[in-house]
Every structure is written in structure tokens, then in C-alpha cells.
Regions:
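Noncatalytic, solvent-exposed loop/strand surfaces
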Residues: 1-290
Length: 290
């Protein structure tokens, strides 16, 4: 599979996932010791360091999540959603190991799957790519007020399945709350005014309290969702596979929802820049002014 993450640039360093994982059989990992992400000098391309988590050896599918950077508790921190279903927190400085490799070793890691997603009640491993099975992280972890928000999901070809949205203390790695009434997602969450918005692949949008995980409302778009929500200017924007651009009111109350059909599936996420809304469908790019 392709490397489908976005590069993260911090100073003179570029952090990017490698997409390392399983082969065509989806059961064999050809390069279990290869890194899931690397850091390069943005000016020269020289390798600065690589992921030291060892996640590749336990890859469920591939390393697709983009990295996140922020200062948490006065410490520069990298956050990555793992191909093994764990979320990792790292220092921004690599350490040289005994073999001479410069590794970014995790300060903490959190399993973002429920235990029964991995092992059933009879003690047997739950098969991957089945509705009750464990998932990797594909969407980018989001940092908001020192907390990390991330959700699990799989390749859309695998269909629907169990999910989980986690809120993690970015400094300690402690799980502050979790929400399991959400299905698999490949979307990145949006957080605005202490509200979290998450869209699941099945087409349902959820709004929760960012501090407690309390659910305020859900909205079913009745179509698959590949992209991520955008919370801006009092609205929550999102496209779906039916080609609908959904416009929901931002807030705790059940939202008024408007839709504009763009004539082709929307697999991307809407973007606002310089007062213009950009939405890409499978056939067109729309630029919508104020």
C-alpha cells in the first residue's frame, strides 16, 4: 500500500511515516525491524533518526498515521498513531543505541483498542479485518490543551467494525476517557471550544465533551465518510461518499443540518484558507467564498 500520511515539518526536521507493514497476504510482515516513521533533515534529506517503538513487528496493516508535534508540560513532544493500534508519545531528540542507530524511543504508549477487540472471552485472538477485531490508527492524533484525541480504524475495504475514541494525557500517557459507541474511522477528529467532533466510516458524526467524553449528539449522513470534520466559524463541515457537503451547527445542541450535493463523491477533507472554503470531489475542486 502507498504511503498516505502527511509530512510534519518542525524547524529543520521532517517527520514522515513509511507505510511499513504487511505484504499482499495481510499475514506476513516482510520487514518487521524497519521503522514505521523516520526523521530527515529538510535541507539535505539526511536521516536524523527513526521510530524506536518496534511497532512494525506487530503491524496490523500499515503505518499510515501522520505525526503530531506540540509542547506539553514544557516539553517538546511527538505523537504518533501506531500501525499496531497503540498511540505513542516521544521526545523530539533521538538516542543512539548500542548498534549505532539513532532512535526515537517512546516515553509512553497507549493501547487504543479494547482488550476484547484483540482477545475474545475464550482467550483466542480475534481475527483482524473482521467486525469485532482490533484496528490500527489511521487518522492523525490531535493535540488540544495538553490532551491527545485519536480513534482507531481500518482500510475501508474491510468494512464496518468496532471502534474507540481515546482522550490521553499528553504528558503521562494516562487514558482520561474513552468512547466506544463509535465505529471504525479513518478520519481525524476536530476539537473546538471543548467539543470533539469525530466522523466514523459508517457515516455517523459524533459530538462529545472534550473534557469528559460525554456524548451530546450524533447525526447520520447515510453515506460512507472518508474525510475529516472541519470546525470553523460556528459550523462543522464534512463531505461524504454520496457527494454531499454537510454543514452542521457547532455546539452542544442537536444541530441544524444543511446539505449541498456536489455531484461526485467527497473523499477528502474540507479546508479553509484566506476566507475561502476548498472542497475536492472525485472530479472537481470547489473554491467557495464568503
Amino acid at each position: 500500500n502507498v504511503t498516505s500520511s502527511s509530512a510534519l515539518i518542525v524547524g529543520d526536521r521532517v517527520y514522515v511515516a513509511t507505510s511499513n507493514g504487511v505484504d499482499w497476504s495481510h499475514t506476513n510482515i516482510p520487514s518487521p525491524l524497519s521503522p514505521s516513521w523516520v526523521a530527515l533533515d529538510k535541507n539535505t534529506g539526511e536521516l536524523i533518526g527513526e521510530d524506536g517503538s518496534g511497532a512494525s513487528a506487530s503491524a496490523l496493516h500499515a503505518a499510515w498515521s501522520s505525526l503530531t508535534y506540540g509542547v506539553i508540560g514544557g516539553e517538546e513532544t511527538l505523537i504518533w498513531g501506531g500501525t499496531d493500534g497503540f498511540c505513542y508519545g516521544y521526545s523530539t531528540q533521538p538516542e543512539r543505541d548500542e548498534d549505532g542507530y539513532d532512535l526515537y524511543n517512546p516515553k509512553w504508549k497507549v493501547d487504543c483498542n479494547e482488550p476484547h477487540y484483540r482477545i475474545d472471552k475464550n482467550g483466542k485472538k480475534v481475527p483482524y479485518a473482521t467486525p469485532p477485531g482490533s484496528s490500527e490508527l489511521i487518522g492523525t492524533p490531535v493535540l488540544y490543551k495538553g490532551k491527545i484525541y485519536c480513534a482507531i480504524g481500518q482500510d475501508p475495504e474491510h468494512g464496518d467494525g468496532v471502534g474507540r475514541l481515546s482522550c490521553i494525557d499528553g504528558k503521562t500517557g494516562n487514558v482520561l476517557w474513552k468512547y466506544t459507541d463509535v465505529g471504525r474511522t479513518i478520519s481525524t477528529v476536530s476539537v473546538l471550544d471543548d467539543l470533539v467532533y469525530i466522523a466514523e466510516y459508517a457515516g455517523i458524526i459524533h459530538c462529545l465533551d472534550a473534557n469528559t467524553g460525554k456524548l451530546y449528539w450524533t447525526h447520520d449522513s447515510f453515506s460512507r465518510i472518508w474525510g475529516s470534520t472541519l470546525a470553523v466559524a460556528g459550523k462543522v463541515l464534512l463531505g461524504n461518499e454520496d457527494g454531499d457537503l454537510l454543514i452542521l451547527d457547532h455546539g452542544k445542541k442537536e444541530p441544524e443540518v444543511k446539505t449541498v450535493n456536489l455531484g461526485a463523491p467527497v473523499y477528502s477533507s474540507p479546508v479553509v484558507a484566506n476566507g475561502t472554503l476548498y472542497v475536492a470531489t472525485q472530479t472537481h475542486l470547489y473554491a467557495i467564498g464568503e
